[in-house]
Amino acid sequence: MKVLVTGAAGFIGFHVIQKLLATEHSVVGIDNLNTYYDVALKRARLTQIGVDPKFDFRKMDLSDRFLVRELFSAIKPDRVIHLAAQAGVRYSLENPQAYIDSNIQGFLNILEGCRHNDV
């Protein structure tokens, strides 16, 4: 089964991907690697997954509906595990648009990708 995991470089996404790969699923991991959390730590997590022919990482922003549409058409996932989100309550007061883009528009784009591709 091909599984799309958003938020792939985050703590939870990283562990979910490891479990999926251990159970013979193929995984496409998506993350925008934003700087809210340490990017070096995110890259280290992706490196720890290692070179696995069943894993494909793509850096992208889920708020771009055209990229998300192209992604779904290209990879044709069987399942989606959506873990991507802009975290941090205090930061939401400083930069509310980042939350709208990631947590609302990004989620809507994932839902639309699922809807249009029978996921």
Residue ranges and their predicted role:
Residues 1-119:
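N-terminal Rossmann-like NAD(P)+-binding domain of SDR-like oxidoreductases, especially those catalyzing
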